[in-house]
């Protein structure tokens, strides 16, 4: 009987050891899979000035482009920018067509359920823009009117949160990008545009005297970088680099380059 107990005990010890070894191996493999990549692919809407857009020669430029290039340099990785359908951005990230969403991406509770966000780095707001010669003076004056906005944007989320205002409108036209929406506003196809402040105000500087902003906003926001929820090493590394660039004045310098003022958030 004693020999049987010894044999059973030895067997249990062997099985336990095997499980522990397998567990260590699994943990090691998990850690290996979480190593920093040699290259990151950034998904963006390449018609989203001044965050990411193309100049007259077709070169990709903008605040987020400059910021992402500097971040990649400090992380020691190569970077590729890949234009995507912004309305399907979460799918592009999940399917690994891209590794990051970095293009004036608003942090929202609904998006947090699908993707991991970096720490916020910039302030934004949702604003209503009308033509300068319009009789519309307030948000309430848009009752029975047509406004435009970008499909899949946080402007749509802001509109959905204000059902009273949305239901008062005659129609809401959705566009592939804000620039197209603002162009339609300029020629009179719509009466107003709900747009990210950073985009709308930048566009207005290129069209002086054409537009004006209605008083107030439809919500304050913060921008962050979107990543896959299981890419914890990448998330942590980027947060560290963003904090560094915030502390050393790099973000402030880039913001002043593109916005003439510092609208970044101190990254903690």
Where are these regions (language model features)?
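Short, low-complexity disordered leader/linker segments with a strong preference
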Residues: 1-39, 263-268
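Ligand-binding clefts/hinges and TM-proximal coupling segments of bilobed small-molecule sensing domains
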Residues: 26-30, 154-173, 212-214, 243-268
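Extracytoplasmic small-molecule ligand-binding "clamshell" domains
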Residues: 32-104, 248
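Periplasmic-binding protein-like
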Residues: 46, 123-130, 197, 201-243, ...
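Ligand-binding cleft/hinge of the Venus flytrap
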Residues: 54, 68-77, 155-175, 204-208
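Extended ligand-binding regions for polar small-molecule ligands
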Residues: 65-74, 140, 145-146, 151-154, ...
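Acidic, polar ligand-binding/catalytic clefts
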Residues: 69, 78-141
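A ligand-binding cleft/hinge motif common to bilobed small-molecule-binding domains
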Residues: 105-113, 160-161, 184-187, 191-220
């Amino acid at each position: 009987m004693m020999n049987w107990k010894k044999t059973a005990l030895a067997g249990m010890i062997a099985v336990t050891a095997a499980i522990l070894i397998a567990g260590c191996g699994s943990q090691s493999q998990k850690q290996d899979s979480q190593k920093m990549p040699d290259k990151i692919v950034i998904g963006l809407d390449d018609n989203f000035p001044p965050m990411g857009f193309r100049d007259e020669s077709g070169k990709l430029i903008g605040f987020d482009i400059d910021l992402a290039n500097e971040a990649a340099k400090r992380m020691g990785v190569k970077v590729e920018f890949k234009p995507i359908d912004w309305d399907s951005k979460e799918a592009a990230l999940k399917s690994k067509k891209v590794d990051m969403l970095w293009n004036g991406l608003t942090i929202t509770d609904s998006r947090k359920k699908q993707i991991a966000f970096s720490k916020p780095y910039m302030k934004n707001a949702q604003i209503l823009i009308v033509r300068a010669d319009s009789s519309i003076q307030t948000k309430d004056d848009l009752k029975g009117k047509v406004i435009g906005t970008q499909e899949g944007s946080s402007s749509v989320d802001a509109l959905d949160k204000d059902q009273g205002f949305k239901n008062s409108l005659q129609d809401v036209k959705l566009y592939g990008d804000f620039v197209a929406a603002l162009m339609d506003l300029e020629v009179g196809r719509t009466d107003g545009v709900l747009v990210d402040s950073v985009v709308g105000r930048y566009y207005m500087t290129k069209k002086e005297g054409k537009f004006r902003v209605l008083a107030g906003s439809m919500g304050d926001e913060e921008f962050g970088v979107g990543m896959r929820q299981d890419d914890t090493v990448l998330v942590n590394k980027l947060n560290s680099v963003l904090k560094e660039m915030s502390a050393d004045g790099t973000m402030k310098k880039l913001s002043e380059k593109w916005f003439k003022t510092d609208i970044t958030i101190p990254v903690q």
